[in-house]
From Swiss-Prot:
Transmembrane segments: none annotated. GO terms for biological process: translation. Keywords: Ribonucleoprotein, Ribosomal protein, RNA-binding, rRNA-binding. Part of the ribosomal stalk of the 50S ribosomal subunit. The N-terminus interacts with L11 and the large rRNA to form the base of the stalk. The C-terminus forms an elongated spine to which L12 dimers bind in a sequential fashion forming a multimeric L10(L12)X complex. Forms part of the ribosomal stalk, playing a central role in the interaction of the ribosome with GTP-bound translation factors. It comes from the Bacteria. It comes from Mycolicibacterium smegmatis (strain ATCC 700084 / mc(2)155) (Mycobacterium smegmatis). Belongs to the universal ribosomal protein uL10 family. The keyword Lipoprotein does not apply. The gene is rplJ. This is Large ribosomal subunit protein uL10. CDD domains: Ribosomal_L10 (cd05797).
Length: 175
């Protein structure tokens, strides 16, 4: 690879690091081209799965200000640059790694911190943002309904008490 090509590749990878919300580093030893294509399809638009030389990736990470990943760049390494929700991409990679033992999750990077394999798996086990928002909305709606019932209860109790008093007075006047 010519020096100019290497510089261009480093700049491209550094730009991907900067543009991504998270990255997941994997080892792809033993995967076929068809397997990699299947993984890229599983990731969809949530991430870009890139294979690059480790030395170029190390330089690009340094250029992008990302630290703590150097030890992950050994052996055949590929990186998933996550554009959207990190949970969706981590779920897809974890599921693919479960089905294809040749794919090994090495770690990742998110919110300025290097992630261990356990961290990436924890992220994969989280609910997606949409599901969490739906659960929050449901909980809020339930609590609002309870609060409305509590606020309405004293008024209805007063109304029932007034009706009972009125009936009692009407009964006393009739007698």
């Amino acid at each position: 690879m010519a020096k100019a090509d290497k510089a261009t590749a480093v700049a491209d990878i550094a730009e991907q690091f900067k543009a991504s919300t998270a990255t997941v580093v994997t080892e792809y030893r033993g995967l076929t081209v068809a397997n990699l294509a299947e993984l890229r399809r599983a990731l969809g638009d949530s991430a870009t799965y890139t294979v690059a030389k480790n030395t170029l990736v190390k330089r690009a990470a340094s250029e992008a200000g990302i630290e703590g990943l150097d030890e992950l760049f050994a052996g055949p390494t590929a990186i998933a640059f996550v554009k959207g929700e990190a949970v969706d991409a981590a779920k897809a990679i974890k599921k693919f790694a479960k089905d294809n033992k040749a794919l090994v999750i090495k770690g990742g990077y998110m919110d300025g911190k290097a992630l261990s394999v356990a961290d990436v798996e924890k992220i994969a086990d989280l609910e997606s943002r949409e599901v969490l928002l739906a659960k929050l909305a449901g909980a809020m709606k339930g609590n609002l309904s309870k609060a409305a019932g509590l606020f309405n209860a004293p008024a209805s109790q007063v109304a029932r008490l007034a009706a009972a008093l009125q009936e009692k007075k009407a009964g006393e006047e009739a007698a």
